[in-house]
Amino acid sequence: MAKKSMIQREKKRERLVAKYGKKRDEIKKALKSVTSYKDRLDLYAKLEKLPRNSFPSRLRNRCWLTGRTRGYYRQFGLSRHVLREMAHQCLLPGVVKSSW
């Protein structure tokens, strides 16, 4: 299980990404249409003034149950350990153990 502080930090990042996402998109759209070098620098400065944790690339996929980042399955939102245990307990409908 991940530390609670790490999970809270990740949730804070998600809130910041949601809060500043629209503003970031507007600045990026303006960057595509601007022709002046000075205006471009001003827009880049605005983009850099946004909080560092508001960038979507700083988000990590985490298991919603344990908070683990490694071995994450996007389809389920779970780490491999939890996915295996839940599949064995028949808590995931449609998931069948493979055999060949």
Curated annotation (Swiss-Prot):
**Superkingdom as given in the UniProt entry:** Eukaryota
Q: GO biological process annotations for this chain's record? A: translation
Query: Quick check: keyword Ribonucleoprotein in the entry?
Result: yes
Question: Any idea which UniProt keywords this protein has?
Answer: Chloroplast, Plastid, Ribonucleoprotein, Ribosomal protein, RNA-binding, rRNA-binding
Molecular function, one GO term: rRNA binding
What is the annotated localization of this protein? Answer: Plastid, Chloroplast
User: Which InterPro entries does this chain map to?
Assistant: Ribosomal_uS14, Ribosomal_uS14_bac/plastid, Ribosomal_uS14_CS
Q: What GO cellular component is one of the record's annotations?
A: chloroplast
| UniProt cross-references to Pfam families, sorted A to Z | Ribosomal_S14 (PF00253)
Which HAMAP family would you find in this protein's record? Ribosomal_uS14_1 (MF_00537)
Q: Identify its protein family.
A: Belongs to the universal ribosomal protein uS14 family.
Please explain the role this protein plays, according to its UniProt record: Binds 16S rRNA, required for the assembly of 30S particles.
What does the annotation say about its assembly with partners?
A: Part of the 30S ribosomal subunit.
Which NCBIfam families does UniProt cross-reference here? PRK08881.1
Please state what the protein is called: Small ribosomal subunit protein uS14c
Source species of the chain = Rhodomonas salina (Cryptomonas salina)
